[in-house]
A protein has these predicted regions:
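An acidic-aromatic
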Residues: 60-131, 186
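Sec-dependent bacterial lipoprotein signal peptides
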Residues: 1-18
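Mixed-charge, Lys/Arg-enriched low-complexity segments
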Residues: 137
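Charged, amphipathic alpha-helical segments
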Residues: 21-26, 86, 156-165
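Glycine-centered tight beta-turn/hairpin loop motif at sheet-sheet or coil-to-beta transitions
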Residues: 50-54, 82-84, 111-113, 158-160, ...
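N-terminal leader/targeting segments and the immediate start of mature chains
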Residues: 14-73, 81-83, 195-202
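Gly/Pro-enriched, hydrophobic low-complexity segments
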Residues: 73-79, 140-202
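Short, solvent-exposed coil/turn segments at beta-strand boundaries
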Residues: 31-37, 60-73, 92-102, 148-149, ...
Length: 202
């Protein structure tokens, strides 16, 4: 009887956080169903290196292709550190005749000779795109927990990555994302979430 009451109490406590209902894990990522633009700033530490580096960037994500929130045009424009200021990395999806999409990534940076564009030959620039891809709902929801002030966290795991999204009460976009993958760890605050009309693949 005591164990039953304990379980019932725990269940009622969970319900006392309405944002942590089972549907919250789905509703939390409603922003990713459309194009959006945010500002991210924080730190990243490469794998095997515990020294964090600071960064800030504008992230724009286009409309999802075929209902898949992870398939879309992406752009990351860095404002810091100084070595990356003005650098833009874009991933563009081009439709093919067979209904598939070809993904092309371009690294662009300003120089004394004008703007230089370097098309990716492989995946050498994918590390820059992780700050955008971390905002897309990949894998599966593996944890949903309430936090102070009516907020909650959602943990997603899959594809060799794990990300913890912190949502504040009443906020449409996550206010913080913690990402861990084979490249290392990223801690970033998210602000200025807004719908975006750009980066819409034809």
């Amino acid at each position: 009887m005591r164990s039953f009451l304990a379980c019932l109490t725990a269940f009622l406590l969970l319900l006392s956080f309405p944002s942590c209902s089972p549907s919250a894990s789905r509703d939390s990522f409603a922003y990713a169903a459309e194009a959006f633009s945010v500002t991210v700033r924080g730190t990243y530490a490469p794998a095997g290196d515990s020294t964090p580096r600071s960064f800030a960037a504008e992230v724009t994500a286009g409309v999802p292709v075929g209902g898949d929130p992870t398939r879309r045009d992406l752009a990351v424009v860095f404002s810091s550190p100084p070595s990356l200021k003005g650098v833009t990395v874009t991933a563009t999806l081009t439709p093919g005749p067979d209904g598939t999409y070809q993904r092309s990534v371009v690294f662009t940076y300003p120089s004394d000779y004008g703007t230089i564009e370097i098309p990716a030959k492989g995946r050498e620039f994918d590390g820059f795109l992780r700050f955008a891809e971390a905002l897309l709902p990949f894998g599966d929801v593996t944890d949903l927990s309430p936090v102070a002030d009516g907020g909650y966290t959602v943990t997603r795991t899959g594809e060799g990555r794990e990300a913890v999204y912190t949502f504040a009460e009443g906020q449409t976009f996550p206010v913080r994302v913690s990402l861990t993958d084979s490249r290392g760890a990223v801690e970033m605050a998210v602000s200025g979430g807004a719908a975006s009309g750009g980066l819409n693949p034809s």
